[in-house]
Amino acid sequence: MKALETMIQNMFHKDCAACTDQEVYEALLTYTKEQLAAKGYHDGKKKIYYISAEFLIGKLLSNNLINLGIYDEVAEFLKKNGKSLAEIESVEPEPSLGNGGLGRLAACFLDSIATLGLPGEGIGLNYHLGLFKQVFEDNLQHEVPNPWITPDSWLTATDVTYMVPFRGFSLKSTMYSIDVAGYENKAIHLNLFDIDLADESMVHDGITFNKKDILHNLTLFLYPDDSDEDGRKLRVYQQYFMVSNAAQLILDEAVSKGSNLHDLADYAVVQINDTHPSMIIPEFIRLLGERGIDFDEAAEIVSHVCAYTNHTILAEALEKWPIHYLEDIVPQLVPIIRKLDEKVKAKYPAENLAIIDSNNLVHMAHMDIHYGFSINGVAALHTEILKNSELHQFYEIYPEKFNNKTNGITFRRWLMYCNQPLTKFISSLIGEGYKKDADELKKLLAYKDDQKVLDQLLEIKTNAKKICKDFVLENTGIEIDENSVFDIQIKRLHEYKRQQLNALYIIYKYLEIKDGKKPERPITFIFGAKAAPAYYIAKDIIHLLLTLETL
């Protein structure tokens, strides 16, 4: 740790022990970024581009230290200087780039791509204020901005810029990059596009802002309120800004490696994470057309490059944009989308297969399915529902495109970082190989009937619950029983996530207790959820849960 010690001296002209937690964090940030850069980056002829409206990457310091293999060394150095890595990390702002499972899956895929040593990168937007920060008053949710970008940040500005055309004006982008460390491997990039004129000061009264001022608001918020037309159009602006930058970057990188663009599928594969990036299909065709490739060939090229991940069977998640929105915002795409629709209707005239329906709504998922080579669900049951019900009409004509990719997690974060006592115990039983190959965790089955091992696991679990108890007390003032059953539901607040059923169960148990029927073991219900600002039923459910807490 001599290099870190020297860096602290050079940055702040004092020893680590005399530095504030903020100063130590800034030094660790710089040191870790240098270590990541020194590792190098995965590259190759063909690259996977994972395009997503959100990346729920979480705090990065400890995760990067673990993947670099220097976590214990850094923690020991800090301890010798009277510092705690946990306290240092509390200073770190969390990137406000994601919201739920869709964004966490994207983050886990990037971790996996880097760890497996595959050439790949993520592409998204650099939201300044995130979704929102949730605050409670009178048992009601209120929203305030969640700024996270500071002068000392994981973001690194690049010299990559593009012009993105809209009706009546163009916007210049700047690409920022965050390094994603592979475990004991090189890194990859998460590339985030931004506008230089983003103005955080235009936000007032919670998260209210002028939704029409695209020159200054485009990258302020993830999922801006879409309860009015201005909000819905802002989302279209965001989505096109994201995919136009992505498409230009991908084509430039392919050409730099020797592609003539007719062979683009040999250089790039694009994973469309839900329907937000769907406009990359017509944008690719537009850009290929500018480079002299005719429409039919361009459509064929794109159909071998793009793949689509479906996350939910909810109709609202299968985005449908009025064609007049696109005419108002990205008119250059409308003739392309109409041609794509005509090609589909010439072969498959059924209304439920159309890209543009009889109400002049553009079905983004339909475009992804017709002009992508793969459609995957994110769990076995989910994929079967897609094939047999929600997207059955597409499965009948494209059975070879449908496949399942069950959601996984980067267990290194959720185990090695979040539960270090359990990590050490598992390593003592089966060795260290599981840290890179999760299949080795199956070796734990040899101990499923070993009472001594089970008792030790229970002790680790109990201690973890005590830590949770202390955290809840410190942050809410509520004291919970670590010996109770922790019934935890952490999901975005939505009717289909069914937090309301859990609330009804709590009411049922409460009434039973009032009648003298106590449960065999105490139960502590823990919820974590945000409701979209204009989703009033979801906000009412939060109100119900917070009111139940006060009984």
Language-model-derived ranges and their functions:
Residues 1-551:
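A conserved ligand/cofactor-binding region detector
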